[in-house]
Amino acid sequence: VITDESRNRTIPINITLPSNNAKCTEQVKCPVAFINAGYGISHNGYTFASNAFNQRGYLTIAVTHELKSDPYLNREQPYLTTRMENWHRGVVTLKFLVNELSSKYPAYDFTKLTLFGHSNGGDISALYGSIYPNEVSTIITLDHRRMLIPRNKNIHVLTLRGSDYPADADVLLNDSELNKFPVTQIMIEKSRHNDMYDGGPKWLVDRMSK
């Protein structure tokens, strides 16, 4: 747990080092990935993703964005407006962690982040990429459905889509936009939105781990 004194907010996190961490130096920095949990799911519920990133040389920081003292996630449409408060709080948390951890882990590059998020954590990731586009290189989301994917030629996006719920209007790119921006949208047949974490069926976890 790390504390943001300015907001009097405790932030549950889990940091895992890459398997090749001995090669990471201040001169040759290794990449960083933030893992943003879905609403109501523990930040420790995405070890398949942490492991995949660690094996590829990333430092991973898994983050819980909801505390018991926070307001409940708004159930009223339009979500792009009503949930912005929640997502923006998540963006402030990520920005705080970037500033706080970059000095503690000088052998890792906090200037070109990879943001990974499931559901509401994916919405937070997409908003962060929209607000701080120069600090993000890659966004990976698991079936986020509310916040628009950044249309930015410098941010690579992979979004894996569940098959049980549609995304809101304009969240995903249309065919002409897909030709312009480095975005990949993949539907995983028979996958369910709420299964896209460690507790989902093994075939799905294996598929997402790739």
Which sequence ranges carry the predicted segments?
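C-terminal catalytic histidine-bearing segment of alpha/beta-hydrolase fold enzymes
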Residues: V183-K210
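Conserved alpha/beta-hydrolase "acid-adjacent" motif
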Residues: P166-L172
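Serine-hydrolase catalytic machinery in alpha/beta-hydrolase-like enzymes
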Residues: T3-Y108
